[in-house]
């Protein structure tokens, strides 16, 4: 979800 952590899902 984040630029530094693209693996996090965007809710």
From Swiss-Prot:
Cofactor(s) the protein requires to work: Cu cation
Lineage: Eukaryota, Viridiplantae, Streptophyta, Embryophyta, Tracheophyta
Keywords: Cell membrane, Copper, Glycoprotein, GPI-anchor, Lipoprotein, Membrane, Metal-binding
Protein family membership: Belongs to the multicopper oxidase family.
Statement: the UniProt record of this protein carries the keyword Amino-acid biosynthesis: no
Topology term for the membrane: Lipid-anchor; GPI-anchor
Protein name as annotated: Monocopper oxidase-like protein 1
Gene Ontology MF terms in the entry: metal ion binding
Organism listed in the record: Zinnia elegans
Keyword Glycoprotein: yes
Cysteine pairings via disulfide bonds: none
Main localization (coarse): membrane
Compartment annotation: Cell membrane
GO cellular component: plasma membrane; side of membrane
